[in-house]
């Protein structure tokens, strides 16, 4: 096949482009692989992450307080004194817990004056810059809104001020100025700071002691040239000051040198020349550099630490702030410092001349003793002239080793403390170096070449992503603890964590001088804690190396994006997102990320019908009705743009076409109430209704109600008296006569309940002489006559009782009767009639009548069991109107009826409703449902996700009292009288309580008014503008004076410089223990009763 020329040229160019791009990508991959290989072979020191260090660290914070820059250790009292912005704290050395907090803020007038001079509100605060524990006192100085002030306070109670003095020349005005101070064993304060508002007059100043106040020469840049003071130490006969300043002896450009300066502590100043000025001031350069043909100097001193046991001064040095970041630690012997000060001076004859070496007139200078004749009798004019012009040493102070102890590129060191550790074979100097990024480097200082510059670990005391320099760093050797001051907190970090290494390999691999493997106990411990020194193993021969193997981690998910998916013949759209295994990437054999890297959701889905439901019951029981069946488009439901189902979701058909309805059956109206069954004592009324056109009407045809509940009165009835009947007639005509009557009483309206009372008999005597008025005399005469004619008189006698009659009722207590006649014999010839009752009555059939069961009325239809998708109504009745007695017939028929409801389809996206929950105390029930859509569309999940309803009466919870159920019965007798008594009692008690509260408030107010006479209480003393004399007016205003060699600051105790606007208030907070009693329900007084309803 022949290819035309232009086409061949185009294909050739395309091939070359692909080849070049392939080669370029191959080179990039090879370069990346090579750099990663170099990273895996690089040796780095171990790093202790913030989360790993956190369990070992104690921290202290205080709301609204910042700049924890001054830390002072007080081991004898087991406390740490902390100076921050506007506050002083006493903390426990064990766990930095708060012992005391004292506010030390500037007054409102002082701050307002500061801001009027152009300073910001942030600058116009009281920043503590001097904090020294001296015996039983704490000496402290603060900037006090550019009006420095100092005070001495009790070391055990910071709120108690012993003495307050001027802070000028002892503390800087500006909190950003570096300063340092030390108190000697004689109680003299040596301060190195700037002593004017603008910060242009630096000085090393002595005060407060028995000697005269002295300072460096004022406005003489050869003595101090824009210095930054770093540290001050009281060593022997000298006071040493470490600083960095612009080098006056450097001829080309501006260069910063690090210096050490010293003065004799018994210096008394000059006479006529150098009056009130140091006569023993000297300074020398500190050399910290990498040796070589062209040395690399670390010129700027940042921190210094004195190790008195070894007569060593350790210093942290960095490069210039505008150059490449690099840091080093160098150590200097005090003998090397003395050697430099005993060497030649460097002197400049005039400003145009060079700085040249000049011999030391006193090569072995020592601070002499003060003669008895006077403090400056031995100072000659020549010696004062030499002291004025010869102060800069020609030779620099050389470090202990030619190379720095530790160096680090790309990092700036800021603080340093040193600990001496006795290992198994030698004594190690362990350096703890603070960095400007907020980490602490733990390093070894040793003469061994294999361990030179050896970093043991790097401690991350700040959480990831937070970078800030350390404000202060202190070490407590006895407790083996570091105390770190940050902008918002104080930390206590242990010097060693030997128990964190759980294996021998990890313990020995840490190369930590504190730690070794205890072979007897098989654990990592310190030398002091080892059980047997001979079995305690250490291996500090090389530096520890961090394991650079790193497992991969997923990065964040990308935003959701639309994507396509294929499912057989169907296709649709989805939302997709992805993440990469790059946070971090697996490195140096680390594991790949575990888990999905792609997430797919909300894929579109076409809807499909479910199967038809079964036909519902016919809508009518007779006559033409209809039946319904349904289906829903939820198998599956359409989602995220999928097609909806095509067709009907509901079908209907006729039913009962051939079942005509019978004549309507209905209840007729109720009839009138019947007469009450009893006139009293409780009866029953009834009324009836009839079921028209049938006998199957729902409900009851009879209703009953009680009537005439009042008790029946007892009715008594007496029978008439019988005629008088003679008894015991004598032959002489004397006799006794009797008559009878009976009493009946009926306590019930039922006549069968009548009871016969006692028979009552009356007797009278009729004498024979006729003196008595007896109506039966003729009858007696007849009897006598008949007796005389017929002597056989026959009295009547009862026949036997007849049988008992049948019971008057079949049940519920009837009665029966039996009778007898007076025929055995009948009374004749004037015989007496039978005495006694002719009839007897007896109770019978006391058992209850049998009861046949009958249905109660139907309850109302219940609520529908579902709001959609098909539910049911329900109603019930019970066989309790009346309930059947044992052995009798039960009710026939159904006790429950149900009907369909809510047959419409449910809204798309919702799950089924949950069951109704339990009733709350408010008498409500609730249920819920959830949306099953991940990203619901506009038509999905419409409606509420929860429903509530009033509880059925039978389910409303009743809150019972705490006492037992039996106790509640005692409240059943609660009536209106009890309610009135309770109300009156509550009113009286509330009145007494109100009176007591009012009297208590009046008493507290009087106490508060009395206390304000001594300590005025104001809402905010910084803004208090009361009408009386302010508290700050008790202090004498300060008259500002220019400080020069002829006008020095005398001792403040002579009151030469009264303080200006020292309106500094202190407020003390003591943390109180939490002794609040816990709430106990059983201690709640009273008892709640619920009367029976």
Swiss-Prot record:
According to the UniProt record, one GO cellular component term is: membrane
Q: State whether keyword Repeat applies.
A: yes
Q: Where is the Sema domain?
A: 45-495
One Gene Ontology MF term: semaphorin receptor binding
Location within or outside the cell: Membrane
Q: Which residues lie on this side of the membrane: Cytoplasmic?
A: 1000-1093
Xref: InterPro entries? Plexin_repeat, PSI, Semap_dom, Semap_dom_sf, Semaphorin, TSP1_rpt, TSP1_rpt_sf, WD40/YVTN_repeat-like_dom_sf
- Its predominant location is membrane
Q: Which domain of life is it from?
A: Eukaryota
Q: Which residues are glycosylated?
A: 59, 95, 157, 178, 287, 333, 378, 532, 539, 547, 602, 728, 944
Record-linked PANTHER family: SEMAPHORIN, SEMAPHORIN-5B
Which family does the UniProt entry place this protein in? Belongs to the semaphorin family.
Q: What is this protein called?
A: Semaphorin-5B
